[in-house]
Design a protein with these regions (language model features):
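Beta-propeller domain segments
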Residues: 1-113, 118-126, 133, 155-156
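Blade-level signature of beta-propeller repeat domains, shared across WD40, Kelch, NHL, RCC1
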Residues: 132-157
Length: 157
């Protein structure tokens, strides 16, 4: 990698024919000089909409409608962050919520589910990967490929 925070995992809109930089550049037109360059491709590169942090391994995501979970009163994305292994201080190992407004990310992420990593980073109790809205439409189901379980996250009954 290029460092602990670079390049960040990201959330972005996708449109047919668009180019997001790989392998020539990242986060817009930031050139990666470790690879042979193609200036025409770098010029076409779009900047992603929202940074999720470096090496968080943000793998699974789903749309969460406003009010589905207590305290989350706007629409947004729930994102399973599988967690890093290749940085000096580990990151990820949780499920975050990114609020949306007008169809775009609009605010800092909030933790939905955390505690999968020991404070001293010596033990991973779980690594969230897949995230879906439960069949009851009032909960999230989170696949954990370390604990080999599916967590159900819902408000108090």
């Amino acid at each position: 990698g290029l460092g602990d925070e670079t390049p960040p995992d990201y959330l972005t809109s996708v449109s047919d024919g668009s180019f997001y930089g790989w392998p020539y550049c990242y986060w817009g037109k930031t050139v990666d000089d470790r690879v042979p360059q193609d200036p025409a491709m770098v010029a076409r590169a779009l900047t992603p909409d929202y940074a999720l942090g470096g090496h968080t391994a943000s793998l699974g995501l789903c749309w969460v409608p406003a009010g589905m979970l207590p305290g989350f009163d706007v629409d947004g994305m729930a994102i399973g962050q599988h967690g890093s292994w290749n940085r000096s201080t580990l990151s990820g190992y949780k499920v975050v919520f990114v609020p949306f407004a007008n169809g775009r990310p609009a605010g800092p992420p909030r933790d939905i589910l955390s505690g999968f990593l020991a404070p001293d980073e010596s033990v991973s109790y779980g690594r969230p990967v897949g995230v879906v809205v439960g069949p009851d439409r009032k909960s999230l189901l989170v696949a954990d490929d370390v604990g080999d379980v599916i967590w159900r996250v819902a408000g108090a009954r």
